[in-house]
Regions:
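Hydrophobic alpha-helical connector segments
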Residues: 1-40, 90
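Short amphipathic alpha-helical interaction patches enriched in hydrophobic/aromatic residues
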Residues: 2-9, 52-55, 74, 78
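Short linear capping/connector segments at secondary-structure termini
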Residues: 3-8, 44-46, 109-114
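Short coil/turn segments at secondary-structure junctions
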Residues: 7, 11, 54, 58, ...
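Amphipathic alpha-helical surface "interface" segments used
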Residues: 11, 46-48, 147-149
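Amphipathic alpha-helical segments used for helix-helix packing
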Residues: 18, 35-64, 104-109
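C-terminal peripheral helix-coil segments that are non-catalytic and often amphipathic
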Residues: 18, 26-29, 64-149
Length: 149
């Protein structure tokens, strides 16, 4: 999907929302179409939340080319964001995606909202809107540490 987004952009700057959709849609589509959605969700949860260094190293190795392609796309879509901010915002984006994939049922149990009734496309659009706002948020300077008396 990222190649399609690049082709559609042509000579124009790649849009952040197009990059986010290219990242989210295949993952949420796979979850929605997987006959055993629970297994897929557990795999995502384990990869993201498991503190197993070997598993994380394996997944980074498997996904290295995808990570590089999306890193370049985010850099292109957000040229003014420095590496540290990009890393943090990407970290928050990945957390929001993983939480949504693994815990959408919590929303239903707390609020009665049937997230499955809307289809994955609506969930993806909400996640795109939310994470795009986070990526575009003003860069804050950390508060200065006060000397203790």
């Amino acid at each position: 999907m990222l190649a399609e987004a690049r082709a559609k952009a042509g000579k124009r700057k790649l849009k952040l929302e197009a990059v986010l959709e290219s990242l989210f849609v295949p993952v949420f589509r796979a979850q929605a179409s997987h006959k055993s959605g629970g297994s897929f969700t557990r795999l995502i949860g384990r990869v993201v939340f498991d503190r197993n260094a070997e598993l994380q190293k394996f997944m980074v190795g498997e996904l290295a080319q995808v990570i590089i392609q999306f890193s370049r796309a985010f850099d292109e879509a957000l040229p003014g964001l420095d590496n540290t901010e990009m890393d943090w915002r990407s970290h928050f984006m990945a957390g929001a995606m993983a939480h949504t994939l693994c815990n959408a049922d919590l929303l239903a149990s707390f609020t009665g909202t049937d997230v499955g009734a809307e289809g994955y496309e609506t969930t993806v659009q909400r996640l795109v809107d939310f994470t795009a706002a986070g990526f575009r948020a003003k860069v804050s300077t950390p508060p200065k540490k006060q000397k203790s008396s």
